[in-house]
C-alpha cells in the first residue's frame, strides 16, 4: 500500500507541475482576503521558507479545487488549528480515490520532489 501511495503522489506531482504557475496566479488575488479574515488555509508551492512564511497559492479550508486534468485537492483542518491536511483526489471532483497529506500548524513540510505544503493555524 505504501508503494501505491508514493507512486500515486509522484504521479500527482508530475501531473501538477505544469499546472502550478497558472493555479498560483489565479489564487494570488485572493490571498489578502484570506489573511484579513484570519481564516485557516494551506499552501502548496515549490519554494517554502518556514522562517519568513513565504509561499504562494493559499486556499480556503474545506473547499475543492481542480489542478490540471483529473486532479483535485481539498483543504481540511482540525478545529484547534494544530494541523492542515490536503486530500488529493484522483478523478473529476473531490470524490473517489484519494490520498491525504498533513502538515503541523505554522510549519513547512516537504511532501515530495521539491513541493511543499504549509499549513497555518486556523483562527476560530
UniProtKB/Swiss-Prot annotation:
Signal peptide boundaries: 1-19
GO MF entry, a single one: toxin activity
Propeptide: 20-37
Record bears the keyword Secreted: yes
A GO CC term assigned to this protein in UniProt: extracellular region
InterPro entries, A to Z: G_crystallin-like (IPR011024), Yeast-kill-tox (IPR015290), Yeast_kill_tox_sf (IPR038651)
Predominant location category: secreted
Covalent S-S links between cysteines: 45-55, 48-108, 64-94, 85-102, 103-109
Record keywords: Cleavage on pair of basic residues, Disulfide bond, Secreted, Signal, Toxin
A Pfam family recorded for this sequence: Yeast-kill-tox
Intracellular or extracellular location(s): Secreted
Assembly: Monomer.
Primary role: This toxin kills sensitive strains of yeast.
Protein's recorded name: Killer toxin
The organism of origin for this protein: Cyberlindnera saturnus
Gene it is expressed from: HSK
Amino acid at each position: 500500500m505504501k508503494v501505491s501511495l508514493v507512486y500515486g503522489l509522484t504521479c500527482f506531482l508530475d501531473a501538477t507541475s505544469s499546472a502550478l504557475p497558472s493555479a498560483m496566479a489565479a489564487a494570488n488575488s485572493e490571498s489578502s482576503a484570506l489573511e484579513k479574515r484570519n481564516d485557516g488555509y494551506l499552501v502548496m508551492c515549490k519554494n517554502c521558507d518556514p522562517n519568513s512564511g513565504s509561499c504562494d497559492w493559499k486556499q480556503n479550508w474545506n473547499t475543492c479545487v481542480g489542478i490540471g486534468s483529473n486532479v483535485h485537492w481539498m483543504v481540511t483542518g482540525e478545529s484547534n488549528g494544530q494541523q492542515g491536511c490536503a486530500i488529493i483526489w484522483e478523478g473529476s471532483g473531490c470524490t473517489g480515490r484519494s490520498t491525504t497529506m498533513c502538515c503541523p500548524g505554522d510549519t513547512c513540510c516537504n511532501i515530495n520532489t521539491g513541493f511543499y505544503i504549509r499549513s497555518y493555524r486556523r483562527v476560530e
